[in-house]
Amino acid sequence: MTLAKRIIPCLDVTAGRVVKGVNFLELRDAGDPVEIARRYDDQGADELTFLDITATSDGRDLILDIIEAVASQVFIPLTVGGGVRAVDDVRRLLNAGADKVGINSSAISNPQLVFDASQKYGSQCIVVAIDAKKAADGRWEVFTHGGRKATGLDAIEWAKKMESLGAGEILLTSMDRDGTKVGFDLDLTRSVSDAISIPVIASGGVGGLQDLVDGVKIGRADAVLAASIFHYGQHTVQEAKRFMSEQGIAMRLT
């Protein structure tokens, strides 16, 4: 049986509001996180990803109250990331109602965190987020702190290392494509998908429904994440699922 591919709307949150930017900058308000999460649940989203995009760079605490409010209204799997620095942060997020926890900047400063968290809570709830940008030498470099800090790490090698330490999924964002609506970086997505055996969630650049199809068929992603096309009413999740299903992709249709 073919495993169904997933559509995951992404809620980037700062100061308690959902926002959307271009290339990780120029943030525009998109609404209240609880309202938006409820709408996507009603539309049949497979999961939601909730990223506190300024938590790490600002050093702010986890926004547990918002997560508790969202989790009380939403009954699909919820991945939450942003500001996760210790195994205890993972515990607090899971207790607040998250099903999975995203680790990004802290995975680089402390890779042991990925191992320890996956050992304690299981790989299935540890998602490592990789924000990658094409470098001058043709490889993809990993960035942290909301895309502000270069690491010198190769994205493909880093994904392999994270898998070996116990990550259950990779959330792979092309910073070059973020918010541009020109489609995923399919070379990046396919290169990482081919290099590891855990699921890859493609992120960054969706402008239309065909981009979602391409992420799966060409990029070989297991799930596709999008924000702009859903937040501003361009498409519903149901439309996206139907379109992907019509293109021969196994989807959970509601």
From Swiss-Prot:
Signal peptide annotation: none
Pathway: Amino-acid biosynthesis; L-histidine biosynthesis; L-histidine from 5-phospho-alpha-D-ribose 1-diphosphate: step 5/9
Domain of life: Bacteria
Key words, A-Z: Amino-acid biosynthesis, Cytoplasm, Histidine biosynthesis, Lyase
Enzyme class: lyase
The protein's Enzyme Commission number: 4.3.2.10
GO MF terms held by the record: imidazoleglycerol-phosphate synthase activity; lyase activity
Residue positions of the active site: D12, D131
Gene3D superfamilies: Aldolase class I (3.20.20.70)
Biological process annotations from GO: L-histidine biosynthetic process
Function text: IGPS catalyzes the conversion of PRFAR and glutamine to IGP, AICAR and glutamate. The HisF subunit catalyzes the cyclization activity that produces IGP and AICAR from PRFAR using the ammonia provided by the HisH subunit.
Record's protein name: Imidazole glycerol phosphate synthase subunit HisF
Subunit structure as annotated in this protein's UniProt entry: Heterodimer of HisH and HisF.
Pfam families attached to this UniProt entry: His_biosynth (PF00977)
Major location (coarse): cytoplasm
Cellular-component GO terms for this entry: cytoplasm
Family: Belongs to the HisA/HisF family.
